[in-house]
Amino acid sequence: MCDLRRPAAGGMMDLAYVCEWEKWSKSTHCPSVPLACAWSCRNLIAFTMDLRSDDQDLTRMIHILDTEHPWDLHSIPSEHHEAITCLEWDQSGSRLLSADADGQIKCWSMADHLANSWESSVGSLVEGDPIVALSWLHNGVKLALHVEKSGASSFGEKFSRVKFSPSLTLFGGKPMEGWIAVTVSGLVTVSLLKPSGQVLTSTESLCRLRGRVALADIAFTGGGNIVVATADGSSASPVQFYKVCVSVVSEKCRIDTEILPSLFMRCTTDLNRKDKFPAITHLKFLARDMSEQVLLCASSQTSSIVECWSLRKEGLPVNNIFQQISPVVGDKQPTILKWRILSATNDLDRVSAVALPKLPISLTNTDLKVASDTQFYPGLGLALAFHDGSVHIVHRLSLQTMAVFYSSAAPRPVDEPAMKRPRTAGPAVHLKAMQLSWTSLALVGIDSHGKLSVLRLSPSMGHPLEVGLALRHLLFLLEYCMVTGYDWWDILLHVQPSMVQSLVEKLHEEYTRQTAALQQVLSTRILAMKASLCKLSPCTVTRVCDYHTKLFLIAISSTLKSLLRPHFLNTPDKSPGDRLTEICTKITDVDIDKVMINLKTEEFVLDMNTLQALQQLLQWVGDFVLYLLASLPNQGSLLRPGHSFLRDGTSLGMLRELMVVIRIWGLLKPSCLPVYTATSDTQDSMSLLFRLLTKLWICCRDEGPASEPDEALVDECCLLPSQLLIPSLDWLPASDGLVSRLQPKQPLRLQFGRAPTLPGSAATLQLDGLARAPGQPKIDHLRRLHLGACPTEECKACTRCGCVTMLKSPNRTTAVKQWEQRWIKNCLAVEGRGPDACVTSRASEEAPAFVQLGPQSTHHSPRTPRSLDHLHPEDRP
């Protein structure tokens, strides 16, 4: 037995922030329906809450928020007529399933890839039959984390693919999308999404004798089968397990079921406890792709007990008579599957919610010993919430306490008088729904008053760790997010300013140890990750500008090179872009015209309208080159934005190539050239900048330490401000995110629908100094267009870096549309995020990073939940 009443020594779990609904008098009653909550790999949280109107009509709402901006809530009228019982994100984090107590299932997807614009176009219905369990079909992708190989050089050794079959495959082995649900009457329903958009739905009984299903959960096997666990709610009844096989026969969905071994909770077989816990209140598989281990919780009105069970293959004794009749049987002992209890707790306070980790840590004894030896604790614990308001993190198998959080630590406004604080008499406010983040470093809970709380879960779980080991664990999880494409916001919660420099250096070191092909796949993602890390320390804030600018430069370079077309169809093995790079690398002449004559200029011919439409991007390249060269005399200042480019031969070479391309296009369309304000009318600004840029590039183009630029080059750069007007660059968009402003042990209290005045830090003050002030005219950061102080066009903003861009394109040329297509799903700060194909071999669409702004925003202003007994002030006549 495990005693959860004893807090773990040094357990580390603290509150990051809480977000509440607007307050009004007499609003202390709980929402009248059970809550559902889901956390996606994009760090989007969805949860349910009802609204009651003046005439007592109830609207079932689904609320979606980004953990970085929790106050910016988007509320969806779900059109569910009964209580929503289940919410489930897909693997890409861009689609959401909702199911209700009337058997209706809706599939929500993002409209225009906006995190605050959702639509439901497909769904299914089992009329009048409440849904008790819901899951997307497995896509066959399973990743294993090898903690013991965290020091290996290859990401392929640290994170390997596990052989796992999809629930259903299309022609060629592509996984078929769809969902499976279990109803309260014992039916299993499967809906398949065909590539044509058609939905195939089939419903079958789990067994011949249908019975009431109060609780159910769904898991998947490596062979492509589905396992469903059910309970009728009584601890005196067995927990049943079924194997479900899905197939498509003659364009129709077919479901086959088979009964598997069942179990009785051990607390019911103990004569002293037989009637103490009459109801099974929670039934969960320990992981979606681990059908051999299950967690059960039985409860009374005041207490609970938790048991962990494992399905094992055991030998079946055979009588000697049968061994003599059949020697083959004697050689190989037959086996059966049998449920065995792994661990159980002592009597606990009543459990109100359970949350399971999503980190794919193996739970075999060998792997658990390795995790213990390496002191890697993320993913080993599950969360239990109790009616007394506390939350316990317990080991997934042994159920030993790892960390404890008490709700008494919840923050209160500083100006709230003590006499006005509510008394503790009566039932404690407790979490009714919980979810762990995808790295198990954060937990979200919705309490009985509708308040949302986000907790940090320390990677050490209170165990004393060396600083180097703690950094290694965070680095390992950052690499995991880099490989999978998952958002790493929850990891940033645990990065202290003193860790940033080491983490960035070690992350770059691990990146350079990968193969060239993998480095190319991850090149933009690691820059975005470095930028988010550098925001957390005042010593590295200016690097954020450099990483952000490099992402933009890479995007411009790849887009402009892709516009080049070979003159003949039977092209050699190299593209025009590759030949441009090769020639510019080989020819080190400082005269731009001499470099240009070595190129096949016919490959650079574009339509005149296209060239003119690209002028804003070409202007940015020209301005950036001028700024870099003018800042060369101040290269000793590490705090100056752009400093890292002065020693980056790759980026300088990229700029040099673009200057050549711009020069050629300027001969075709002079009005597309960058505009410089020069003191002399006869000065060739492009030639001057190319000459200085080439000299600087020669100093650092080779691998190894860069040589110092000669004094003549520095002197020429000193003269630039007297020859050309140096532009002021917009280094960073304004961002009002939380993660860089959170302080340890100082939780924030926020309110839905009201942007807070967040406390500043040394890092955020520097960040604000590098961004445009709120009152200044806005700029479209991706199109480089000025929008004015109050834009009239609909805009969207990145939820991570704050980049603003117009929602609808003002351009019609194909080339510019190609540039804009790059930013439909994501922004600079999240470019490359989303499930990808480097290790996980997923080709799912990337999750968006934008929310809509402007006068026609689809954002619904959140209001206080109306599932309360008293009228809201706005509802009173």
Swiss-Prot record:
Cellular compartments per GO CC: core mediator complex; mediator complex; membrane; nucleoplasm; nucleus
GO molecular function annotation: nuclear thyroid hormone receptor binding; nuclear vitamin D receptor binding; transcription coactivator activity
Positions annotated as WD repeat: 21-71, 72-119, 120-165, 166-203, 204-257, 258-334, 335-415, 416-460, 461-495
Gene3D superfamilies: YVTN repeat-like/Quinoprotein amine dehydrogenase (2.130.10.10)
One Pfam family it belongs to: Med16_N
Keywords of the record: Activator, Nucleus, Repeat, Transcription, Transcription regulation, WD repeat
Keyword Nucleus among UniProt keywords: yes
Signal sequence residues: none
Basic and acidic residues bias locations: 866-877
PANTHER family per UniProt: MEDIATOR OF RNA POLYMERASE II TRANSCRIPTION SUBUNIT 16, THYROID HORMONE RECEPTOR-ASSOCIATED PROTEIN-RELATED
Protein name: Mediator of RNA polymerase II transcription subunit 16
Protein's organism: Homo sapiens
